[in-house]
């Protein structure tokens, strides 16, 4: 045994004696600020890379999990052997998460990664002579203003999630945490400072004056919650300025689908102040599809994506089909039956027009012969309903287990593959028509500004003013013969605190 130990020691000593002591690396090539920026295209690419990161931060993972799954409209149930993930979704649902959750880490890391990228690009741009690349000083100021806007946009998540966060504007310096008020004041001052340097109505996927003004609206609307100081007057003034066209010309789309099909066949909704343009195989909203779609939805929606069958709308009905009586939740049944959005999603033409916002009930195969709609062939499940019709239900329970399953009750851990209606607010259009993953994802809509201004007026006691603003948007959701019944201005007593919250949820 001793001899064996000595052999090991000698072997290790031999490795040490022959190890390299010169640890300086030999660099054969590298990309630095000095050699990357060769032309104006390189500068533009560096700028838009920050938007790509912003989309990733804003439209996947942490934002949905921390802001939506913790609320009462969306859920990610355990579906038999699928989706428990160590209980992380259950803890979000029950508000029992810990600081060790991946979502909490990502809620901190993703925005700060975006901030670091902004700071790095800002440092590059501030030290570049744009005229060398035949770009004007005005263009340089615009690009820098966009990066500062994106940096604040990332801070919007941080102040909402954590309140106390470092204000980081330098790529070298490590900062201590700042107070919520300090973070708020930094965000506000940055946005106000860059407004004049941005154009109006810039177009798709870029911040402009209205985009920055809209972020200020969000900032002021949430100020009381974030810093304990009411800023509703400032919110009202900024929102009204946007509606008055001070920062660009926008209008409410007459078609409720318009903002969400922007980008299809060249259509651009005038309602979208800021939208992220996506394109299949180049820049995709993959998480938005996969997280909420069933594995078999590809056969009804016409695409070749698998889907994860993760989440769905929170249920409106109990195990026996009765409506829940809770004030919160029940997102599907919060839509009146006369609301034209409350329909099963269905493509109705060859050019990608569709109706409805929900996958619900029995699922049927896409009609390739017509190029839209469905055939009579039923799609079948693969888990609890393997070989049986896939029928989405607005309930949570182990129905496939009969009375034994019902006895378990309705709980987030007792889902099945068909549990929950699926929201398709962002339409997944036919791949065979080259429309799949081609519609933009709207980050800021003019409707949000109308509703923010309405909230300010409602809080100040001007219910009629609030009702008119809400009605200006929601009139498109009802047939003319039904509108008088649902107009808030005509039925002002219906506009209560609870109804206002429900209407915000529907929009």
What are these regions (language model features)?
Residues 20-85, 192-193, 206, 210, ...:
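An aromatic- and glycine-enriched ligand-binding surface/loop that stacks and positions planar moieties
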């Amino acid at each position: 045994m001793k001899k064996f130990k000595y052999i090991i020691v000698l072997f290790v000593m031999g490795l040490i004696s022959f190890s390299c002591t010169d640890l300086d690396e030999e660099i054969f090539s590298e990309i630095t600020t000095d050699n990357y920026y060769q032309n104006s295209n390189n500068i533009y690419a560096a700028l838009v890379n920050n938007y790509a990161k912003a989309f990733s931060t804003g439209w996947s993972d942490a934002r949905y999990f921390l802001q939506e799954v913790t609320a009462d409209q969306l859920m990610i149930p355990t579906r038999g052997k699928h989706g428990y993930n160590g209980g992380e979704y259950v803890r979000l649902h029950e508000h029992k998460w810990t600081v060790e959750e991946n979502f909490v880490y990502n809620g901190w890391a993703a925005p700060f990664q975006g901030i670091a990228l902004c700071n790095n690009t800002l440092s590059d741009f501030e030290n570049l002579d744009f005229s060398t690349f035949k770009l004007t000083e005005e263009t340089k100021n615009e690009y820098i203003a966009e990066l500062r806007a994106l940096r604040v946009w990332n801070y919007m998540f941080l102040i909402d999630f954590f309140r106390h966060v470092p204000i980081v504007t330098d790529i070298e310096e490590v900062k201590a945490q700042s107070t919520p008020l300090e973070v708020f004041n930094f965000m506000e001052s940055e946005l106000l400072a860059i407004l004049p340097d941005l154009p109006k109505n810039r177009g798709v996927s870029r911040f402009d004056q209205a985009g920055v003004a809209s972020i200020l609206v969000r900032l002021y609307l949430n100020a009381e919650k974030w810093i304990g100081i009411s800023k509703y007057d400032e919110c009202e003034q900024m929102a009204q300025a946007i509606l008055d066209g001070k920062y660009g010309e926008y209008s409410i789309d007459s078609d409720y689908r318009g903002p969400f099909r922007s980008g299809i066949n060249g259509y651009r909704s005038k309602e979208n102040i800021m939208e992220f343009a996506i394109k299949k195989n180049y820049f995709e909203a993959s998480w938005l599809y996969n997280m909420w779609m069933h594995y078999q939805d590809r056969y009804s929606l016409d695409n070749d994506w698998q889907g994860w069958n993760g989440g769905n709308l929170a249920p409106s009905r109990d195990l026996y089909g009765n409506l829940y009586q809770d004030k919160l939740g029940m997102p599907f049944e919060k839509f009146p039956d006369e609301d034209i959005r409350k329909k099963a999603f269905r493509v109705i033409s060859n050019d990608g027009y569709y109706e409805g916002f929900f996958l619900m009930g029995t699922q049927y195969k896409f009609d390739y012969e017509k190029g839209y709609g469905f055939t009579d062939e039923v799609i079948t499940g693969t888990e609890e309903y393997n070989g049986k019709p896939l029928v989405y239900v607005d309930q949570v329970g182990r129905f496939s287990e009969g009375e034994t399953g019902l006895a378990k009750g309705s709980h987030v851990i007792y889902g099945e593959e068909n549990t929950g209606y699926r929201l398709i607010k962002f339409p997944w259009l036919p791949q065979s028509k080259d429309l799949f993953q081609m519609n933009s994802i709207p980050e800021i809509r003019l409707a949000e500004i109308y509703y923010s201004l309405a909230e300010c007026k409602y809080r100040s006691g001007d219910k009629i003013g609030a009702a008119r603003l809400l009605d200006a948007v929601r009139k498109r959701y009802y047939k003319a013969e039904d509108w008088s019944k649902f107009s808030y201005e005509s039925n002002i007593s219906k506009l209560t605190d609870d109804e206002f919250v429900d209407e915000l949820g529907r929009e």
